[in-house]
């Protein structure tokens, strides 16, 4: 039995979907422990591409149980739409293999309206690039202890009272500050209950389900969303998400003790990308950046937005290692670098006249660093057909080993293409 946490080591979009899908074969239960539908996993199975926003990608494997933990914020409308889409493609979506924690907080219609109104109201320089899906406002209500939880769907009177109480404040903001029309409590209640009727059969005690699985000797895979440097506490604040994305939250967001987590795999893309606003020291606003974007198909699975691209930032990776304590690294999209004559790695920053090995902690400090690069030979070889470590060209192996040396963490998986079988185990 092995319990594995998979988390992103950069700004999200590291290729977690493929690695989770690969590791699912070796797991019995897959748990999503934070975030909402602001993140998307793209999984390629044969000729079929699946994009999952809420439901763990383990659902694509027969016989696997998928759980959505208390650390997630769930949009009932999106959840129901995702269920219908997967079911139409022949995937078993029965409550016996997909469960939602009763403690999971729900994204309400007014959360989405507030998220979009607030971002539109900000001046250009203050925008943080939110997806506008209500994630932040939902986490706000959770922290303020006025949120709606999944279990409330089975208690209509409690749900209605929570909606009415929330709209007293939300409507004051809509009409008084943002110039929006007020929302009607009855309309919101009816909309939520319409989706809630489909959602209630999936409610369960997720913590208990995980502990029962362990008692039976089964393995659990904890699937993180987004990336370390979008973490609400440890990311490039304020250009971050609203939840903790680091590995430690796998326990809190699922209802299990951290001592049960055996292995932590950090997913690292072979170059760096970022969606939306925020500092990005190694960003390439040139032909090389365009090359990476086009060859790597760097467009958001959730928003379709172009991802900003740049060289691998080892300063960011060192911080990720310090925060997450990974046992090993899965290196993804190495094949995208094929065709580049030279490849650079940022090994340090210059900040306030000094060379530093870790990101500055002041707000927007990373917007004022200068990357220090080392350059390595590139390669022209197409490596997508390589199936063993020995078959990789020498410059490719040198690049992988250099990343391993800088981070101090073994790279156990090397992805050389989007398919499941285009992965080399070391």
UniProtKB/Swiss-Prot annotation:
PROSITE patterns: ADENYLOSUCCIN_SYN_1, ADENYLOSUCCIN_SYN_2. It holds the Pfam family Adenylsucc_synt. Gene3D superfamilies: Adenylosuccinate Synthetase, subunit A, domain 1, Adenylosuccinate Synthetase, subunit A, domain 2, Adenylosuccinate Synthetase, subunit A, domain 3. It catalyses: IMP + L-aspartate + GTP = N(6)-(1,2-dicarboxyethyl)-AMP + GDP + phosphate + 2 H(+). It comes from the Bacteria. Plays an important role in the de novo pathway of purine nucleotide biosynthesis. Catalyzes the first committed step in the biosynthesis of AMP from IMP. This is Adenylosuccinate synthetase. Pathway: Purine metabolism; AMP biosynthesis via de novo pathway; AMP from IMP: step 1/2. InterPro entries: Adenylosuccin_syn_GTP-bd (IPR018220), Adenylosuccin_syn_Lys_AS (IPR033128), Adenylosuccinate_synth_dom1 (IPR042109), Adenylosuccinate_synth_dom2 (IPR042110), Adenylosuccinate_synth_dom3 (IPR042111), Adenylosuccinate_synthetase (IPR001114), P-loop_NTPase (IPR027417). Its EC number is 6.3.4.4. Homodimer. Mg(2+) binds at residues 13, 40. Substrate binds at residues 301-307. SMART domains: Adenylsucc_synt. The active site is at 13 (proton acceptor), 41 (proton donor). Its main location: cytoplasm. Binds 1 Mg(2+) ion per subunit. Belongs to the adenylosuccinate synthetase family. GTP binds at residues 12-18, 40-42, 307, 333-335, 415-417. It is found in: Cytoplasm.
């Amino acid at each position: 039995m092995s319990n594995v946490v998979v988390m992103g080591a950069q700004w999200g979009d590291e290729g977690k979907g493929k690695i989770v899908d690969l590791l699912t074969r070796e797991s019995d239960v897959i748990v999503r422990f934070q975030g909402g539908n602001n993140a998307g996993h793209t999984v390629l199975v044969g000729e079929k591409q699946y994009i999952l926003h809420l439901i763990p990608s383990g659902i694509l494997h027969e016989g696997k149980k998928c759980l959505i933990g208390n650390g997630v914020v769930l949009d009932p409308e999106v959840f129901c739409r995702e269920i219908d889409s997967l079911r139409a493609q022949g995937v078993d979506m029965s409550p016996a293999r997909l469960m939602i924690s009763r403690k999971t907080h729900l994204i309400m219609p007014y959360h989405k309206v507030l998220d979009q109104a607030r971002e539109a109201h900000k001046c250009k320089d203050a925008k943080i690039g939110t997806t506008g899906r209500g994630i932040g406002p939902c986490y706000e209500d959770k922290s303020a202890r006025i949120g709606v939880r999944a279990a409330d769907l089975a208690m209509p009177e409690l749900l209605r009272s929570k909606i009415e109480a929330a709209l007293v404040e939300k409507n004051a903001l809509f009409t008084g500050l943002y110039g929006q029309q007020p929302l009607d409590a009855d309309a919101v209640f009816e909309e939520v209950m319409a989706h809630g009727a489909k959602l209630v059969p999936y409610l369960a005690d997720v913590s208990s389900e995980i502990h029962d699985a362990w008692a039976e000797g089964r393995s659990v895979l904890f699937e993180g969303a987004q990336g370390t440097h979008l973490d609400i506490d440890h990311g490039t604040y304020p250009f971050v998400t609203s939840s903790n994305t680091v590995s430690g939250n796998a326990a809190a967001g699922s209802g299990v003790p951290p001592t049960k987590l055996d292995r932590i795999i950090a997913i690292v893309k072979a170059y760096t990308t970022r969606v939306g606003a925020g500092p990005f020291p190694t960003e390439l606003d040139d032909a090389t950046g365009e090359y990476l974007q086009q060859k790597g198909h760097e467009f958001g699975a959730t928003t379709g937005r172009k991802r900003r691209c740049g060289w691998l930032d080892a300063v960011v990776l060192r911080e990720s290692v310090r925060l997450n304590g990974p046992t090993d690294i899965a290196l993804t999209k190495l094949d995208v670098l094929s065709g580049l004559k030279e490849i650079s790695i940022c090994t340090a920053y210059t900040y306030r006249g000094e060379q530093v090995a870790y990101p500055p902690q002041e707000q927007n400090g990373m917007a004022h660093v200068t990357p220090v690069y080392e350059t390595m030979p590139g390669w022209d070889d197409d490596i997508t057909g390589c199936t063993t470590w020995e078959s990789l060209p020498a410059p490719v192996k040198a690049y992988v080993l250099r990343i391993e040396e800088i981070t101090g963490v073994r790279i156990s998986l090397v992805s050389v293409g989007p398919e499941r079988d285009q992965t080399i185990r070391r």
